[in-house]
């Protein structure tokens, strides 16, 4: 285990010890069915990324599982702009497609479980499209900027947008806490989620050996 609290399962899989505790907490209560649905939605999202990475012969390095996110590390330097963009947005597209399909089934066979599956997929799609560097939306935005501007302009444009998005993210987090009248549980979850995502941005444990 390294200083980041990572357990090395294999050369291609690492998991945060806090993720294990989070999974135990989710499945310990009566909401185990809904926890399984959420994990299935997350798995669908990440599997879509991995599928296209393999399809386009990108060099796959490892998957790191955090309590509030999963990082897929791969060498995409040999991929074209279009293929890399497809790999980046594959997860969000799979969630969007799952949402559309489940909407159809919800109309025919309404159920709370199916409704939750719909909400999970639309939530994952929306959150991952946030234009922060460690989300799919931020990675896609970076690709688009660097493909359309010279290197210097692209660098400063991307940095400016990244900072603006980070400020917006923090403001939204504060709004969530304020909306709950600063409920201690909500505050703890929001702060931990924010720290986890920014830690993911600052450090990539897949490069540590």
Task: Identify the function of each model-found stretch.
Residues 1-209:
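Hydrophobic transmembrane alpha-helices and their immediate loop junctions
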């Amino acid at each position: 285990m390294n200083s980041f609290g990572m357990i090395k399962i294999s050369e291609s899989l690492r998991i945060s010890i806090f993720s294990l505790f989070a999974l135990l907490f989710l499945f310990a209560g009566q909401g185990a069915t809904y926890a399984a649905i959420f994990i299935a939605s997350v798995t669908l999202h990440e599997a879509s990324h991995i599928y296209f990475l393999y399809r386009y012969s990108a060099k796959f390095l490892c998957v790191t599982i955090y309590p509030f996110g999963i990082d897929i590390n791969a060498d995409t330097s040999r991929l074209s702009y279009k293929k890399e963009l497809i790999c980046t947005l594959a997860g969000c597209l799979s969630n969007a497609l799952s949402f559309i399909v489940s909407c159809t089934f919800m109309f025919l066979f309404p159920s709370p479980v199916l409704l939750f599956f719909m909400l999970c997929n639309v939530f994952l799609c929306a959150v991952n499209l946030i234009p922060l560097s460690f989300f799919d939306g931020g990675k896609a935005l970076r690709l688009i900027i660097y493909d359309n501007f010279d290197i210097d302009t692209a660098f400063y444009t991307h940095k400016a947008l990244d900072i603006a998005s980070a400020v917006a993210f923090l403001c939204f987090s504060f709004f969530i806490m304020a909306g709950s009248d600063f409920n201690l549980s909500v505050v703890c979850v929001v702060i931990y989620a924010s720290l986890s995502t920014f830690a993911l941005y600052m450090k990539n444990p897949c490069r540590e050996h």
